[in-house]
Design a protein with these regions (language model features):
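Conserved polar/disulfide-associated segments of primarily extracytoplasmic proteins
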Residues: 41-129, 136
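N-terminal "mature-domain start" segment
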Residues: 20-44
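Soluble non-cytosolic domains of exported or imported proteins
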Residues: 30, 68-72, 141-145
Length: 158
């Protein structure tokens, strides 16, 4: 009983003192994303890149409005980004929030030895393209966790 109580107290104190990495938020009129505050951002003509200072990968966000891309072509569009020979069924889609269709695709670039994870949110003529790319040797443990947490924090406002 005492051992259980000591273990319980230890676990409670451990989880209550565990620190979350401080974050900052990149925000536009249309979306927001939160990422570690030590990471950098660039805005290259409306294409946003968010990356750790050692530049071993990045999250890239592009938004398109008045884009005439039929939903039936979106999976082909995603595969074409990587010149992938994968079948369209590897691109998963589901009904997302706020009326957007969400597409997900994972790709490993053998030549560059990099992982690519893509999300596309599409509604009518609006499309948000969010990607993670990360060198294979860093796609583990902490970096994978940080990239995924930032990726999952992406929220469309409208």
């Amino acid at each position: 009983m005492k051992k259980t109580l000591v273990l319980l107290i230890f676990l409670i104190s451990f989880y209550s003192t565990a620190q979350k990495i401080p974050g900052k938020t990149y925000e536009t009129d249309n979306y927001a994303i939160t990422f570690p505050d030590t990471w950098k951002t660039t805005d290259d003509s409306g294409i946003i890149n968010i990356f750790p200072t050692n530049e071993i990968g990045a999250i890239t966000i592009s938004e398109y409005h008045d884009l005439n891309l039929p939903k039936g072509e979106t999976k082909k569009f995603i595969l074409a980004l990587y010149k992938s020979a994968d079948e369209e069924k590897k691109v998963k889609n589901s009904n997302g929030k706020k009326g957007y269709t969400e597409y997900n695709y994972e790709y490993f670039d053998e030549k560059e030895k990099a992982f690519w994870i893509t999300k596309v949110f599409q509604k009518e003529k609006n499309l948000y393209l969010i990607t993670i790319n990360c060198e294979q040797k860093y796609w583990n443990g902490n970096y994978m966790k940080l990239f995924n947490e930032a990726f999952e924090s992406f929220k469309i406002k409208k």
